């Protein structure tokens, strides 16, 4: 906690007066055993990133009014037996590969949508997937997706408040195209 406060304090001069901070904390496992003889500090490394929240939020605000283009990429979501999707980690090269693929598509506001290894909708590279149709929110089964605060808020709070049903199921790309 002290390190976060120290980082924010050192970065204050780079922020505008009313900026909110987006803090990302990455912790590595430390050196692999093959490097045990290297003469450096052993143990985990902590990286604290601090940047203005407006860099992401401000650039996305128009999407709430105009929507975005979902692009199904050739990059698949990593199945749960290889990496537990309940672990929110920052080491997701497959997300980067999907985003690079989408960045090559003509147009703007293109966002990657990944399929699971069976060809069903899994998730975006930084988002859960929800589709509203006939008073029902459809979302992928939780097998290969990050289950977190956003998903729980939509399912447990937002859907009931709006009188919407929620169905967790395998969603085919065809279902999204309709």
What are these regions (language model features)?
Residues 1-20, 26:
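Glycine-rich, N-terminal phosphate-binding loop and its surrounding beta-alpha-beta segment
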Residues 1-10, 33-178:
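Helix-start/capping segments and mature chain N-termini
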């Amino acid at each position: 906690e002290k390190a976060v406060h120290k980082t924010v304090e050192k970065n204050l001069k780079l922020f505008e007066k009313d900026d909110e901070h987006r803090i990302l904390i990455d912790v590595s496992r430390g050196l692999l055993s093959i490097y045990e003889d290297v003469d450096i500090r052993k143990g985990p490394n902590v990286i604290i990133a601090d940047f203005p929240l407006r860099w992401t939020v401000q650039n996305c605000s128009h999407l709430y009014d105009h929507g975005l283009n979902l692009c199904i990429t050739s990059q698949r979501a990593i199945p749960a037996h290889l990496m537990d999707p309940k672990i929110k980690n920052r080491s997701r090269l497959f997300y980067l590969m999907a985003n690079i693929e989408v960045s090559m598509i003509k147009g703007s506001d293109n966002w990657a949508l990944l399929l699971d290894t069976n060809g069903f909708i899994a998730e975006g590279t930084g988002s859960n997937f929800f589709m509203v149709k006939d008073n029902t929110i459809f979302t992928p089964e939780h097998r290969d997706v990050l289950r977190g605060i956003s998903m729980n808020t939509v399912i447990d709070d937002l859907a009931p408040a709006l009188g919407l049903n929620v169905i967790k199921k395998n969603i085919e790309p065809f279902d999204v195209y309709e």
